Amino acid sequence: MMEILRGSPALSAFRINKLLARFQAARLPVHNIYAEYVHFADLNAPLNDDEHAQLERLLKYGPALASHAPQGKLLLVTPRPGTISPWSSKATDIAHNCGLQQVNRLERGVAYYIEAGTLTNEQWQQVTAELHDRMMETVFFALDDAEQLFAHHQPTPVTSVDLLGQGRQALIDANLRLGLALAEDEIDYLQDAFTKLGRNPNDIELYMFAQANSEHCRHKIFNADWVIDGEQQPKSLFKMIKNTFETTPDHVLSAYKDNAAVMEGSEVGRYFADHETGRYDFHQEPAHILMKVETHNHPTAISPWPGAATGSGGEIRDEGATGRGAKPKAGLVGFSVSNLRIPGFEQPWEEDFGKPERIVTALDIMTEGPLGGAAFNNEFGRPALNGYFRTYEEKVNSHNGEELRGYHKPIMLAGGIGNIRADHVQKGEINVGAKLVVLGGPAMNIGLGGGAASSMASGQSDADLDFASVQRDNPEMERRCQEVIDRCWQLGDANPILFIHDVGAGGLSNAMPELVSDGGRGGKFELREILSDEPGMSPLEIWCNESQERYVLAVAADQLPLFDELCKRERAPYAVIGEATEELHLSLHDRHFDNQPIDLPLDVLLGKTPKMTRDVQTLKAKGDALAREGITIADAVKRVLHLPTVAEKTFLVTIGDRSVTGMVARDQMVGPWQVPVANCAVTTASLDSYYGEAMAIGERAPVALLDFAASARLAVGEALTNIAATQIGDIKRIKLSANWMAAAGHPGEDAGLYEAVKAVGEELCPALGLTIPVGKDSMSMKTRWQEGNEEREMTSPLSLVISAFARVEDVRHTITPQLSTEDNALLLIDLGKGNNALGATALAQVYRQLGDKPADVRDVAQLKGFYDAIQALVAQRKLLAYHDRSDGGLLVTLAEMAFAGHCGIDADIATLGDDRLAALFNEELGAVIQVRAADREAVESVLAQHGLADCVHYVGQAVSGDRFVITANGQTVFSESRTTLRVWWAETTWQMQRLRDNPECADQEHQAKSNDADPGLNVKLSFDINEDVAAPYIATGARPKVAVLREQGVNSHVEMAAAFHRAGFDAIDVHMSDLLTGRTGLEDFHALVACGGFSYGDVLGAGEGWAKSILFNDRVRDEFATFFHRPQTLALGVCNGCQMMSNLRELIPGSELWPRFVRNTSDRFEARFSLVEVTQSPSLLLQGMVGSQMPIAVSHGEGRVEVRDAAHLAALESKGLVALRYVDNFGKVTETYPANPNGSPNGITAVTTESGRVTIMMPHPERVFRTVSNSWHPENWGEDGPWMRIFRNARKQLG
């Protein structure tokens, strides 16, 4: 039976206005829209009055918006029937954890009530199309129609393909019907194999074969034999990549054989809790570094949010599934798309060339895709610290004559680093009889055919198959699985995981055969043991769907009880679906129909299918020299600063958490003005050391339109000039991931790919001492469509993205582009040796040209000398600032340095050649360094010792003030106000934020950038930062116990425990499941801290589901009430813990006036480094800190203080319960965005009780308790940041 419960309004006023504006633009006479959430409860038994009231209370969440009786025509948007939304899974979990077992499932829809003039059927279809994503959602016209969401269908049996009766044609038909993308020789192979077995294949077997052998999974092109211009080539592409490892195997522990590569890390204290006691402690051991970079291009073109989200999610799983289990740590992301053409902000180089119907626009991709990728990382709890963004779309004269080149099929790059224990780097042995386990969520009818679909050019497959290959994301489920993996690796030798893979393309049909065959075993499986939410799925759908957030593992039979205990505690679902066999055979039994859908020798599935040969021709690019008439430097500057590749990326940065883990030493945002220009990302290896890891990206794809090999060399060179800015030491410590994107089969591209791989694998990397132990290829980068009567195609440039990873010696010595105005000199190190080539530059692109000669690595020895010289200068502390030269050339390098330093530039380019345009806009490799004037000679001498004497040019100095001036021989070449340039550079991000977020907030942030008087972040402390007020209490040897409380989806508990640990506490890991099952109580604890993250993925209101699981459970409710009423206890709630505790007002004495915390005014997750002041309040944690003003990490989507009315706010203020407020850089309490990131009244961001024993705050002190984890800090801070004081105050209060 289904029950319908009304919810709160679903759209804020500005969202409704945006929708109305879209309807107006489409000439649809819609005058009003009202939208509210509707909840549907599928019940297995009726609820009594109390239970009904409880369910209603559970479904009351979010900001208090006025709802009203709806008018107009109803359009109900719900998830597609036959799928279960992530919202539903989490909301149902909450209902069950609150004791409502009668609820089978909760689902949510949005009811839109449309008031409009007379609309035709076609117009109603347009309205409907605007209101839902057809890939994920459906539209009903009555609330009762939602019954279809809970319809259950009968299981369907396996079907077979009549090969023996109909011969080869049966396979050809099945290939088309199932979208298998099989090649002719593969059809021959299958015909032969099944004829020998003497039986017809089942659809599931063919599907499984297609997935396992798709280009996506098998990398046929990279393993192919090559004939170029009639000549047989000696090596495959993959062999040339492997050559880098054969030449330089140094520091690599695992390459080419696992889900990620592993290199040596540093010996540090890894901090985690003991399995038996729950007590956190440091464990001194090597933290080896794993690295992985994936692409998720096809799904992102079809449905950008889930496409990018599951791209990040899949890459995170790859990291977790390395060796015998590992820990993902920090991420990077990248996008290449066609031109944005932002409405009202179209740029002179952006022409509309059309696109296929079924893929979305570049603007849609860049609006939704980055949000999806960021949301997954945020909710999983992984900081996203690095990225790139390129737009390109043009008709150019390239290798194949004049044609359209661009990224209608986008690149969505997702990568990252993690850590792994030394004894878990290699996979274990799978013994016969080992249990084969699926860890993670249930099977669902989604993502069918992702592997085969992404191996086709976009526009070739059937639109319905495209629908089927879109996946959905549930990061909070993946977090639970990762917690299980963490518990396993933390057990060291007792780790129950023998072997682990993630489930990706092809679902279990790919993952399980890979798991057993990699372990040298076969497997026998039972189909009906697989967790499934949809009983009507066919065997093919159950076995082959790509439901996300799943891993496959082999666990020794005797370890299963331990594994079961770990999963139950973390509430991570799992199923034992089979066991490993001696015989290398794969069998899948279906007990419902008592038949065998799969019964195959493993070698038929994974055997040597025919090897591909690529027989290709070389084409030479024509390229026309840059036509320069009409190009002035002033116009070029403005255009280039508007090119998205060059322009400010804030809209891509602040949506992603950059502080979670407490181990981020360098994020994108640099300096007191938080400008996104960092050269590389840096994390600390642990919470107790200065060792670390760095990552950086290099890519220069447009150059491939002129010279394939140069483009590949530049990508390596740029990654190197980016990562050089931190203290790494020997270049052999740097390892690269190479991600290759190409339109295989397009004239000239295959030979070009071979040339590019050879340039990097056989020549450049071996010469530099660099290794490529990991990478990926995507070989179908082309879209085709019909535009009127014309066939069109858009082909991407050959695109190599290089991600560089390295161990860092000391994270404190990372140099940023932030200029200083002390007596200084700016030096350009020009690795282009004066070539100043303008082909395929940002300058060429903004004038709709390609040019003829591009930049290149001019001298490999000098590139190596450059890296070594910068490392020497970093180690000698001789660099004040550093920024590499890249897109936009020297002009952009200097401008970005000036933006970060909020200063002027007085530059002189006389020595850079007579062609001023080329001197300023060429994109040859190199960097600008800033040194003290007194050190200039010494620095030039170090550069000369490394063979760079002829590359070094003095180009002027940074000066205080607002003028950005470039001269040559006394003549002014260019002069502008730095503020004006800063505003031009910011206009793209402003326009994107206006479109995507609350436009008022976007306007406020943009306006703040034009204030030259802004002093930037600054610190005023009312206490001595170096005084340890806890020292006398720590000296007693007594360590009070603090319960570090987490719920499923919480992700900030480890750094919280570390902060309390440093202050003299015994930090104990307490999961809500421990309290609900009675394994642990709160009576032994002196302090309690509720940590940040996304409990239940913020479903049913941030922190509200967590709070209700306490309030609606009598025993746990009493446990908390007793704790809060016990004198001599302290409690802290941070972020999600703050939201949760604000909902426990009825249990916490003195908290009656606390507000609620709801959706930010920007309607967006905000990750900022914000200035707050400590106000006079009873809070015991903030004693002795009143009047201090200091920055703190902020990361939340629902942090806005909501009070009932003005009287409530006045009472909260007059009682003195406000503990922290946001202030602007002038020290004034603010409600202006983004200094106040969530729009809270009076800047309120922390409150306390009347006794001061319980304090709750939205910002994250635990993520910045170490100086090194602050995005910016004054030079004179030592190891401890000022926020360490609150943890020491806690220790002092407990005596």
Swiss-Prot record:
Nucleotide-binding in keyword set: yes
Binding-site residues, ATP: 307-318, 678, 886
Catalytic center residues: 1135, 1260, 1262
Top-level division of the source organism's lineage: Bacteria
Location(s), subcellular: Cytoplasm
Keywords of this entry: ATP-binding, Cytoplasm, Glutamine amidotransferase, Ligase, Magnesium, Metal-binding, Nucleotide-binding, Purine biosynthesis
Modified how: Both N-terminus methionine truncation and retention have been observed for this protein.
EC number: 6.3.5.3
Enzyme class: ligase
GO cellular component: cytoplasm; cytosol
Reactions the enzyme catalyzes: N(2)-formyl-N(1)-(5-phospho-beta-D-ribosyl)glycinamide + L-glutamine + ATP + H2O = 2-formamido-N(1)-(5-O-phospho-beta-D-ribosyl)acetamidine + L-glutamate + ADP + phosphate + H(+)
Glutamine amidotransferase type-1 domain: residues covered: 1042-1295
Disordered: annotated segments: 305-327
Pfam families: AIRS_C, FGAR-AT_linker, FGAR-AT_N, FGAR-AT_PurM_N-like, GATase_5
GO BP terms, alphabetized: 'de novo' IMP biosynthetic process; glutamine metabolic process; purine nucleotide biosynthetic process
GO terms, molecular function: ATP binding; ATP hydrolysis activity; metal ion binding; phosphoribosylformylglycinamidine synthase activity
pH and activity: Optimum pH is 7.2 with only 50% of this activity retains at pH 6.2 or 8.0.
Presence of keyword Cytoplasm: yes
Binding site for Mg(2+): 718, 722, 884
Subunit structure: Monomer.
PANTHER family: PHOSPHORIBOSYLFORMYLGLYCINAMIDINE SYNTHASE
Free-text function comment from the UniProt entry: Phosphoribosylformylglycinamidine synthase involved in the purines biosynthetic pathway. Catalyzes the ATP-dependent conversion of formylglycinamide ribonucleotide (FGAR) and glutamine to yield formylglycinamidine ribonucleotide (FGAM) and glutamate.
Family affiliation: In the N-terminal section; belongs to the FGAMS family.
Name of the protein in its database record: Phosphoribosylformylglycinamidine synthase
Annotated organism of origin: Escherichia coli (strain K12)
